[in-house]
Amino acid sequence: MKNKIFIVSVTFLLFSCNGNLFTELSSKTGDEDYIFLAQKYVDQMQYDSAINVITTQLSAVAQNGVKAREILASSYGGKCGLNFIDYTGKLAAQATGSSFYILMSPFIGVVVQPQFCRTALDTMELIGTTESRTVNQNAFVAVLGMVLMGTALRGYADIAPALGDGTADVDLCVGVTNAQIDDVVIGFGYMSKNFSALSSSLIGGNSSTSLNAVINSCSTIAGSSCQITDEAAITAPVRDTVRDLVQTAEYGIGTYATGGNDLLVPGACP
């Protein structure tokens, strides 16, 4: 490609920028120079190096800045398993599949570390609430929530072979621990709260329709609990709802068939 696409720039500027964005920054010094360096590390998928620059070389003031936090969140997202362009491209290419399978399938054959998605989301929360962040930032948060769910399900439920094959290998009702299902609950909450910032052109019409459907179904069953992003607020009924959704064939990666009747979802896990 003639112009190198920068991952973080793409993430927060909706694919409108290339390397020329940083031309003038390359001549700057101090914190701005370190920001530029960290940006380059993220573009090269050297996430630990980017994190090291942001957390050890920037001044305290710069570390608390929006740009530094965006880069830091992108770095942790990368460690979780997210390549923004690759992931959204795979979502856009999905023509079929249930909601949770759509989220999980891009991580088949990929090493995943869901805990770093949690750290990335915590970092974005430091920038501000959903109401105070920009649309682009909220779109990134929604994607991080989706990636948290996808990496969690692939890592916790699709365990054979070692990097998964797209099918669940554990009993989704009892074989996924509370701590593990909490990743799915929290990821769902972030996706749900920020989903309006995502366009169908970014994630594809089928993925958009499918994910919107599972958001609506969860809201019908559990109301505002489907937007929980604080682990301390998670209750047993919320975990049950998410387990039920994941166990269904229509929304999840399980075998329980509802025939399209959402009233049957709560019976997926007895």
Pin down the residues of each PLM region.
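Sec-dependent signal peptide recognition
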Residues: K2-V8
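C-terminal motif of bacterial Sec signal peptides marking the signal peptidase cleavage site
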Residues: L13-S16
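Short, charge-rich amphipathic alpha-helical segments embedded
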Residues: V53-I85
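Short coil/linker segments at helix-helix boundaries
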Residues: F22-F36, D48, N52, G78-T134, ...
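Short, low-complexity, Pro/Ser/Thr/Gly-rich segments in the mature regions of secreted, periplasmic
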Residues: Y251-P270
